[in-house]
């Protein structure tokens, strides 16, 4: 039985009707059938949940003004603004202090990739889902040319694109939803990609590359 650390940007047990939350919950319960899964995320308050083969711990989100500071800091470092918005020093500290206790670290969304431990030698899997840089670029094009929202989305698309390439370099495997998304990725990263559809039955494919890699 493998020990898996599963990092989410949001509480996967919140019953929130959101694609990333639903997808994360399905992954967690599928993985917990044959492994022990420790799940951590941000939430509105500190909380814990425990079942036979999984446990969950949430870390309270930082206040809005500190978030603004982290967002600005992300921009200064030429990184996506979302990394600052979803950053938690408590999660960063928890991962750095505990990752050695796990066989695999599973990151849900590029927003959690910033928690990859320094000098990490563990298998790290990133469920990217979609290439968000493409989504933001398309969203940007829908706004009037001089609309400041268009500028924000366009800049974020460039920052996310740069960060996606960073993730392709650093992670053992990258999960994407569709072949269309996979076709947009540079050829040198193709061997790191795996298509995992939204269906719960297809999530079991994840075990194959755990065994191969």
PLM feature spans:
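Conserved donor-binding/catalytic core segment of Leloir-type glycosyltransferases
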Residues: 5, 209-213
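Acceptor-binding helix/loop patch of EC 2.4 sugar-transfer enzymes
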Residues: 64-82, 124-162
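N-terminal subdomain of nucleotide-sugar transferases
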Residues: 1-54, 100
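Short beta-strand scaffold positions
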Residues: 107, 176-177
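Short N-terminal targeting/anchoring amphipathic segment
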Residues: 95-113, 122-125
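A conserved catalytic-core segment of Leloir-type glycosyltransferases
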Residues: 42-93
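Membrane-proximal helix-turn-helix segments that form the acceptor-binding/catalytic region
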Residues: 26-27, 89-96, 132, 149-174
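Carbohydrate-associated surface elements
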Residues: 180, 199
């Amino acid at each position: 039985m493998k020990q898996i650390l599963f990092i989410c940007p949001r509480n996967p047990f919140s019953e929130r009707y959101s694609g990333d939350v639903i997808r994360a919950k399905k992954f967690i319960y599928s993985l917990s059938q044959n492994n022990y899964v420790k799940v951590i995320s941000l939430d509105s308050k500190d909380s814990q949940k425990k079942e036979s083969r999984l446990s969950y711990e949430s870390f309270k989100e930082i206040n809005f003004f500190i978030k603004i500071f982290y967002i600005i800091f992300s921009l200064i470092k030429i990184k996506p603004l979302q990394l600052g918005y979803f950053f938690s020093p408590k999660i960063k500290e928890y991962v750095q202090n505990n990752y050695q206790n796990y066989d695999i670290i599973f990151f849900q969304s590029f927003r959690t990739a910033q928690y990859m431990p320094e000098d990490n030698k563990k298998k790290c899997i990133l469920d990217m889902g979609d290439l968000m840089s493409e989504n933001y670029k398309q969203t940007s094009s829908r706004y009037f040319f001089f609309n400041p929202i268009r500028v924000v989305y366009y800049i974020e698309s460039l920052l996310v694109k740069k960060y996606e390439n960073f993730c392709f370099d650093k992670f053992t495997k990258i999960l994407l939803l569709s072949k269309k998304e996979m076709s947009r990725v540079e050829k040198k990263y193709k061997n790191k990609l795996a298509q995992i559809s939204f269906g719960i039955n297809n999530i079991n494919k994840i075990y194959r590359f755990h065994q191969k890699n």
